[in-house]
From Swiss-Prot:
Induction: Induced by salt and cold stresses. Residues 19-187 form the NAC domain. This is NAC domain-containing protein 77. Expressed in phloem. Probable transcription factor involved in stress response. Binds to DNA-specific sequences of CLPD1 and OAT promoters in vitro. GO terms for biological process: regulation of DNA-templated transcription. It is found in: Nucleus. One of its GO terms (cellular component) is nucleus. Gene3D superfamilies: NAC domain. GO terms for molecular function: sequence-specific DNA binding. The gene is NAC077. InterPro entries: NAC-dom (IPR003441), NAC_dom_sf (IPR036093).
Amino acid sequence: MVESTTSLVKLEQDGGLFLPPGFRFHPTDAEVILSYLLQKLLNPSFTSLPIGEVDLNKCEPWDLPSKAKMGEKEWYFFSHKDMKYPTGMRTNRATKEGYWKATGKDREIFRQPAAVNTSSYGGSSNKKKQLVGMKKTLVFYMGRAPKGTKTNWVMHEFRLHANLHNHHPNLRLNPKDEWVVCKVFHKKQGDEAINNQQQQPQYAAVDQYSAETPNSGSSVVQAGDIDGGDDFFQLDDIIDPSIYFVSNSSNILSAPPNNNNAVYSVSASTTTTNTTAVSFQQQPNYYSLINKSSSSSSSNYSAPLQQHVSSWNITPGAGGAHGIGSSYYNLQQQQAAMVKALENVIAVPNFGTLLPSSNKLKGLSKSAMAGLTQQNPLGVPQYKIENYGDHYISRQ
């Protein structure tokens, strides 16, 4: 036996609505528009058991639960919109303690088409959803704009759409004299902090130095926002300028040994490193060379220069993975031009003991000659280092 609606819904002595345990007043947005707000606009004397009337401009949000007819976590009210100015269209949303501020974009409310059984007609329903209303979201702020303090009180304001005129000729909508339905609720503190709890790890990360990108220019890396700001630093300050290469056998990013501090003797032999992939060697650090030379006495230039002699014949291989091909500069001429440009700063270095003339090289063994040219990769012509020796010896 099914109980009647009148036996389920009872009125208390104070006029409030009482529902048995388990029953809640939880209408959809379309039901709020069509079953309550539309009836109020068609008949201003319409009253509803679950929805009362209230002037939102004279009530603070924390006072509204006690004025509602029913509800535990959300409360519904009919409210008459109040214009801020007699000749304007702006709504007055201020209270004694604060104001309601609209947030986000108004949402459309549609009435779903009635389910029609079209199987007997051999077709399908072509009815579309009908736009019947709009919903605006507002948040209550304490104080006065624009320096108000945001609270967790939220209101959804439902209003009718002009499309309903087509179905209700007696409906008169006046923006300055309009009823709306307001749903007020207090948002939990945890709901607003859900996104803030998902904190991402903060750390200063440096991108892995890639062999697929040429080392040209200065690279800038942005660190994590640790102190509330963006920190930038140069890769040149934290990474060894040795240029990396990829080994086809292991596919592991590795770097050749740092040969800057090694001085190759004429009689010493050096083992040549052969790889199947194209390798890139290091060029001299001119900046360090100038600093070291400038800080030392003017009479002694050979000591700081010996640390970089091994780099003067270390040149990049042709046709590498970085796109260095035939259009690359003639580094032999570039090195000579750099020496000439720096001779006023570092004076003319004496390479006589390090790079002998061609006459002195004639009697050297093959292993000694390999020591002078060991850094030349495969496929690149051997550079005549003895020309450097002849050049400097002749100028002394």
